[in-house]
From Swiss-Prot:
Keywords associated with the record: Cytoplasm, DNA-directed RNA polymerase, Metal-binding, Nucleotidyltransferase, Transcription, Transferase, Zinc
Cofactor(s) the protein needs: Zn(2+)
Listed Pfam families: Zn_ribbon_RPAB4 (PF03604)
Cross-referenced SUPFAM superfamilies: RNA polymerase subunits
Gene name linked to the record: rpo12
Subunit structure comment from the entry: Part of the RNA polymerase complex.
Cellular localisation: Cytoplasm
Keyword Transferase attributed: yes
Lineage top rank: taxon: Archaea
EC number, UniProt record: 2.7.7.6
Molecular function GO terms recorded: DNA binding; DNA-directed RNA polymerase activity; zinc ion binding
Positions of Zn(2+) binding: C8, C23, C26
Protein name from the UniProt record: DNA-directed RNA polymerase subunit Rpo12
Amino acid sequence: MDYKCTRCKRPVEIDYGYTGIRCPYCGHRILVKERPQSSIKKVKVE
């Protein structure tokens, strides 16, 4: 999965086997957290 570095805004490929990686362009530390699947609520449009 690709992630955009918050410092240099370049795309960084993330390996979910690691919890922390660094941006190869600027060295900014990226912490990877698994997020639970959110449920999508359907709403009726009137």
